[in-house]
Amino acid sequence: MNIRNARPEDLMNMQHCNLLCLPENYQMKYYFYHGLSWPQLSYIAEDENGKIVGYVLAKMEEDPDDVPHGHITSLAVKRSHRRLGLAQKLMDQASRAMIENFNAKYVSLHVRKSNRAALHLYSNTLNFQISEVEPKYYADGEDAYAMKRDLTQMADELRRHLELKEKGRHVVLGAIENKVESKGNSPPSSGEACREEKGLAAEDSGGDSKDLSEVSETTESTDVKDSSEASDSAS
């Protein structure tokens, strides 16, 4: 099972999933409105064959008088794939994206008063709180619970995770820098010392300097080749 960000080509299959699972249905343009306006916030669950078995359709509320907050427009999981934790994972992923992309402080939704399974998920698992009852919210006249989930704790956890990740990155970089500095301060290898001695000998000699230079160049070339081969075999 895979959960990923919804793409434009997923929207028609999301609508099909909605029609199978929920009485609250939307025109295709409403899915495109979400997908194009807030592409980071909607997610789908797909099976091993890449078939969509669940989705969450989410957006940010555009209220200048309130703190930044998101809204879950629709959540659905096909009956064949329920009780696998997909709804919770979809909701958490959408909430996390709201925090990371828009600094959301809370997320809201509406749910039918008669939908006990959804109420249990929202209240007991996802820590949503009922904020008010909206009479006759649905087309058939049923009341809705307006619910909110505070995202402060999730935001703090994400922040700590990023801090630990950044700290770990600095530790790795520090170790690399120390290793480079240690290598730079180490004494020359036996091969390098040998080449230096031969170079000095060539400078001190008179008429034989040309021959010694040729010998030195030949030896240096051989040393480099041998060193390369040893390195390859060691790796």
Curated annotation (Swiss-Prot):
Region of interest (Interaction with NAA15), residue spans: 1-58
N-acetyltransferase domain: residues covered: 1-152
Modification after translation (UniProt): Cleaved by caspases during apoptosis.
Organism of this sequence: Homo sapiens (Human)
UniProt protein name: N-alpha-acetyltransferase 10
Quaternary data: Component of the N-terminal acetyltransferase A complex (also called the NatA complex) composed of NAA10 and NAA15. Within the complex interacts with NAA15. Component of the N-terminal acetyltransferase A (NatA)/HYPK complex at least composed of NAA10, NAA15 and HYPK, which has N-terminal acetyltransferase activity. In complex with NAA15, interacts with HYPK. Component of the N-terminal acetyltransferase E (NatE) complex at least composed of NAA10, NAA15 and NAA50. Within the complex interacts with NAA15; the interaction is required for binding to NAAT50. Interacts with NAAT50.
Gene that this polypeptide is encoded by: NAA10
Catalytic activity: N-terminal glycyl-[protein] + acetyl-CoA = N-terminal N(alpha)-acetylglycyl-[protein] + CoA + H(+); N-terminal L-alanyl-[protein] + acetyl-CoA = N-terminal N(alpha)-acetyl-L-alanyl-[protein] + CoA + H(+); N-terminal L-seryl-[protein] + acetyl-CoA = N-terminal N(alpha)-acetyl-L-seryl-[protein] + CoA + H(+); N-terminal L-valyl-[protein] + acetyl-CoA = N-terminal N(alpha)-acetyl-L-valyl-[protein] + CoA + H(+)
Positions where Phosphoserine occurs in the chain: 182, 186, 205, 209, 213, 216
Family matches, as Pfam families: Acetyltransf_1
Region (Disordered), start-end ranges: 178-235
Major site of localization recorded for this protein: cytoplasm
Disease tied to this entry: N-terminal acetyltransferase deficiency: An enzymatic deficiency resulting in postnatal growth failure with severe delays and dysmorphic features. It is clinically characterized by wrinkled forehead, prominent eyes, widely opened anterior and posterior fontanels, downsloping palpebral fissures, thickened lids, large ears, flared nares, hypoplastic alae, short columella, protruding upper lip, and microretrognathia. There are also delayed closing of fontanels and broad great toes.
Feature: compositional bias, Basic and acidic residues: 193-213
